[in-house]
């Protein structure tokens, strides 16, 4: 019985140590989520305005740009998967990988070969273990991405897209060959309690038209010209799309981690309470047995006299 009591006390200490870790992770995530949300909210107006400007350019001028034109018989599709660098964030990464596999299946059914790009160590490890050839990977900033990180990623993706598919071979390769489409898989932040894994095509670009109030049509003049202005804005637009996805994912990761660590802390509390109750019962049983043995011994001595 004493051995069982020692075992219970050891389990209580272990649960207490785990609780300290999960509580610390919960507090860290809680402290960072507000800043992540603020960065996300501050980036959204810029993304909206640059999208509106490109919409105006596309509507008012006849533009023929590689990032606007659908390619005949596309064979290779670049896919950027945005994951986390660290774990302890619930089903955050599992949902991303599940959504990515769904996209890969759709691409293969359409006769397109996925070409993989990843952000985050979790995606790097996940796809390396499954023998995927990862064309390019970026790590170390999943919780706090910068615009420079997004610009580097967008530059790599745009270069691959502009290079295009030359040989038409249908194989996974990290040889630097071009792609005919660009997709991004990330987690959209909706609220502290709701995040969803999303997949969007970013090239060839689908211009998102914004509804305007009914009234006289506004006429625009472009200086120096619409094509040059479009070519100047387009890299910023694509970088902004990637940056927004990184910020959405960062906020979602922190929210998932905060929620997962709170759940783990609550479970540790429940486990400690249950183990403490069991330990108290074992201790009471041990004391009762000891008292019974003492009383029995005293009675035996009294009878012997």
Swiss-Prot record:
| Topology versus the membrane | Peripheral membrane protein
Please state where this protein is localized: Cell membrane
Q: What biological process terms from GO does the record include?
A: proton motive force-driven ATP synthesis; proton motive force-driven plasma membrane ATP synthesis
InterPro entries recorded:
ATP_synth_F1_ATPase_gsu, ATP_synth_F1_gsu, ATP_synth_F1_gsu_CS
Look up the record and report any one GO term of the cellular component aspect: plasma membrane
GO terms (molecular function) for this protein are:
ATP binding; proton-transporting ATP synthase activity, rotational mechanism
Give UniProt keywords alphabetically: ATP synthesis, Cell membrane, CF(1), Hydrogen ion transport, Ion transport, Membrane, Transport
The reply on keyword Signal is no
CDD domains referenced in this protein's UniProt entry, alphabetically:
F1-ATPase_gamma
Instruction: Tell whether Ion transport is among the UniProt keywords.
Output: yes
For this chain, the family text in UniProt reads:
Belongs to the ATPase gamma chain family.
**What function does the entry list?**
Produces ATP from ADP in the presence of a proton gradient across the membrane. The gamma chain is believed to be important in regulating ATPase activity and the flow of protons through the CF(0) complex.
Note the PANTHER family from the entry: ATP SYNTHASE GAMMA CHAIN (PTHR11693), ATP SYNTHASE SUBUNIT GAMMA, MITOCHONDRIAL (PTHR11693:SF22)
Complexes and interactors: F-type ATPases have 2 components, CF(1) - the catalytic core - and CF(0) - the membrane proton channel. CF(1) has five subunits: alpha(3), beta(3), gamma(1), delta(1), epsilon(1). CF(0) has three main subunits: a, b and c.
The record's NCBIfam families line, in alphabetical order, gives:
ATPsyn_F1gamma, PRK05621.1-2
What name does this protein carry?
Answer: ATP synthase gamma chain
Please name the source species.
Mycobacterium tuberculosis (strain ATCC 25618 / H37Rv)
